[in-house]
C-alpha cells in the first residue's frame, strides 16, 4: 500500500490536516473573549493532557491495524464495526461544504490580486457574493479541482510532497503578517491612539477580572471544544494518516510535533489578527468565524492604506493553504475508505468521490439562494444548509464518536493495546500513566459534556 516516506512527511501532512480555518477564525476570537493569556494557559494544559491522548489514540489505531476507520474498528472488535461507519460519516458530511468555504477564500484572494479590495471592505459585500447564483460555484470548483488533483497523485507524490512545500510557506506567511501587525498604529477621530503592541498585550496578558467558577468552566469548555475540533480527531482522518506511517517511525515524537505545529499556528494567528483588529476597530471589532475573515479583516486591510493590498494577498493565500491541506485530508480519508471498501484503484475512487463532492457542494452553494432556509438548531444558533451539515458532523457526531472510542479503548480493548503500539520499537512512552488515566476516566466524561453542550442538549436537560 501507500505510505509516507518518513516521519517528517507524516508530521507535516497531519499538521496540515489539523491546521484549518478554525485555527485562524475561531482561536483568536475565543482568546480575546476568554481573558487572553488565561485562555492560552488553559489551552496549553489541555493540549498536553487531553489533546495528546486523542491524537495518539487515532494515529496508533491506524498504524497498528493498517486500515481506515471503516475497517479499523472492526479489526479492533467486530461488535464495534458500527463505530467505523459512524466515523466514515463525518468526512462524508464535511466534504459537502469544506470546498465551499475554500471557494470563498479563493474569491477574496483573487479579488485582492486584481483590485485594491476597497469593495470587499464595504458592508454587504460578503453576503452579496455568497447569495449570488454562479460566482460561489465557480470559485468552489477551482478549490475542489486543486484538492482532487493532489489526492489523485497519491500519498507520497501528492499529499506529502504538497505538505512539505505548503506548511513551511504557511508558517512563513503567518509570521510575516504577525510581525507586521505588531508595528501598526492608528489614531481615532477623537485622538485615541492604539498600537499593535497594546493589541498584543490584550491578547497574551491573563485577565482574571470577574473570574468566577462558572466563568472558568466556560473558558475551560471553550478551550476544550476548540482543541477538540482543531486536532482533526474522530473524523477518521488521523486513523487514515496513521495507517500510512511506517512502523519504525517514533509515534510519541510525531504526535508531539503535530500538537506543537497546530498550537503554534493557532497562537500566531492570534498574534496576527488580534493586534490588527484592535488597532483599527478597537476591542469591539473581534468577531468569530466567517464574519472575522470576510467582513472585519477586509475593513482592517482597507484602513492600512497602500499596504493593505499586499497584506491581504498574503493573508488569503495563507488561509487558502490552511483550508487546502485540511480539505485534502478529508477527501483522502473518503478515497482511502472507498478504496478499501470496493477494492478499486485510487484513480477510480478519486473520480467517484470528486463527483460526489462536486454535486453536494453545488447544493450547499445553492443553500444561500435558491434553496435558502433558516433552521433553529438545538444549540440556539440559526443555520442555513451549510451550518446544518457542520452541526451534524462537528457538534453531534465528533464528540459522540470520541466518547465511544474512549470507551472502546479504555474499557473494552484496554489502553495497553495503544501503549504497546507507541512503544513498538522500544521507545519509552513517558506519559503512559497519564494516557491510561485520561482515556478511561477523563476523556469519556469530558466528551459527554462536550457532546451535551455543543449539541445544545445540555440546555434542554438543565
Where are these regions (language model features)?
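Membrane-interface "cap" regions at the ends of multi-pass membrane proteins
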Residues: 1-25, 54-59, 63-75, 81-82, ...
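Transmembrane helix-boundary motif of multi-pass solute transporters/channels
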Residues: 6-44, 237, 253-256, 260-263, ...
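Select transmembrane alpha-helical segments in multipass membrane proteins
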Residues: 3-14, 40-42, 79-92, 138-143, ...
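Membrane-water interface regions at transmembrane-helix termini and the short interhelical loops
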Residues: 30-34, 60, 75-76, 82-91, ...
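Helix-loop-helix connectors at the membrane interface of multi-pass transporters/channels
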Residues: 102-131, 242-248, 253, 257-265, ...
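Inter-helical loop and helix-membrane interface segments of multi-pass membrane transporters/permeases
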Residues: 30-34, 67-86, 99-158, 186-221, ...
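A generic transmembrane alpha-helix motif of multi-pass inner-membrane proteins
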Residues: 379-410, 430-462
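Membrane-embedded translocation segments of transport machinery
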Residues: 1-4, 160, 164-324, 328, ...
Amino acid at each position: 500500500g501507500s505510505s509516507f516516506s518518513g516521519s517528517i512527511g507524516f508530521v507535516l501532512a497531519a499538521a496540515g490536516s489539523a491546521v484549518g480555518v478554525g485555527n485562524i477564525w475561531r482561536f483568536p476570537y475565543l482568546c480575546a473573549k476568554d481573558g487572553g493569556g488565561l485562555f492560552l494557559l488553559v489551552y496549553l494544559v489541555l493540549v498536553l493532557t487531553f489533546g495528546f491522548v486523542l491524537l495518539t489514540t487515532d494515529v496508533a489505531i491506524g498504524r497498528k491495524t493498517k486500515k481506515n476507520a471503516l475497517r479499523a474498528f472492526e479489526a479492533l472488535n467486530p461488535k464495534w464495526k458500527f463505530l467505523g461507519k459512524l466515523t466514515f460519516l463525518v468526512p462524508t458530511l464535511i466534504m459537502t461544504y469544506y470546498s465551499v468555504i475554500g471557494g470563498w477564500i479563493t474569491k477574496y484572494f483573487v479579488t485582492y490580486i486584481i483590485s485594491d479590495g476597497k469593495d470587499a471592505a464595504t458592508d454587504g459585500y460578503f453576503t452579496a457574493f455568497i447569495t449570488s447564483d454562479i460566482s460561489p460555484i465557480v470559485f468552489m470548483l477551482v478549490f475542489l479541482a486543486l484538492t482532487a488533483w493532489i489526492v489523485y497523485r497519491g500519498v507520497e507524490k501528492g499529499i506529502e510532497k504538497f505538505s512539505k512545500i505548503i506548511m513551511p510557506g504557511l508558517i512563513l506567511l503567518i509570521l510575516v503578517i504577525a510581525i507586521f501587525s505588531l508595528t501598526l498604529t492608528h489614531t481615532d477621530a477623537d485622538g485615541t491612539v492604539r498600537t499593535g503592541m497594546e493589541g498584543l498585550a490584550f491578547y497574551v496578558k491573563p485577565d482574571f477580572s470577574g473570574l468566577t467558577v462558572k466563568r472558568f468552566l466556560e473558558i475551560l469548555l471553550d478551550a476544550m471544544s476548540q482543541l477538540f475540533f482543531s486536532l482533526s480527531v474522530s473524523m477518521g482522518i488521523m486513523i487514515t494518516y496513521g495507517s500510512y506511517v511506517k512502523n519504525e517511525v517514533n509515534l510519541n515524537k510525531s504526535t508531539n510535533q503535530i500538537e506543537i505545529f497546530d498550537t503554534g499556528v493557532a497562537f500566531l494567528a492570534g498574534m496576527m489578527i488580534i493586534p490588527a483588529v484592535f488597532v483599527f476597530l478597537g476591542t469591539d471589532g473581534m468577531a468569530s468565524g466567517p464574519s472575522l475573515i470576510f467582513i472585519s479583516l477586509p475593513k482592517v486591510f482597507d484602513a492600512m492604506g497602500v499596504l493593505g493590498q499586499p497584506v491581504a494577498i498574503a493573508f488569503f493565500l495563507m488561509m487558502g493553504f490552511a483550508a487546502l491541506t485540511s480539505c485534502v485530508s478529508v477527501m483522502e480519508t473518503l478515497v482511502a475508505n472507498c478504496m478499501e471498501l470496493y477494492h478499486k484503484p485510487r484513480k477510480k475512487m478519486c473520480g467517484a468521490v470528486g463527483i460526489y463532492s462536486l454535486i453536494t457542494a453545488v447544493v450547499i452553494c445553492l443553500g444561500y439562494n435558491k434553496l435558502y432556509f433558516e433552521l433553529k438548531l438545538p444549540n440556539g444558533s440559526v443555520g442555513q444548509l451549510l451550518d446544518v451539515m457542520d452541526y451534524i458532523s462537528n457538534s453531534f457526531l465528533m464528540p459522540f464518536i470520541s466518547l465511544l472510542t474512549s470507551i472502546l479503548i479504555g474499557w473494552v480493548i484496554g489502553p495497553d493495546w495503544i501503549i504497546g503500539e507507541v512503544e513498538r520499537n522500544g521507545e519509552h512512552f513517558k506519559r503512559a500513566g497519564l494516557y491510561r488515566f485520561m482515556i478511561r476516566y477523563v476523556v469519556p466524561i469530558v466528551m459527554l459534556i462536550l457532546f451535551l453542550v455543543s449539541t445544545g442538549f445540555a440546555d434542554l436537560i438543565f
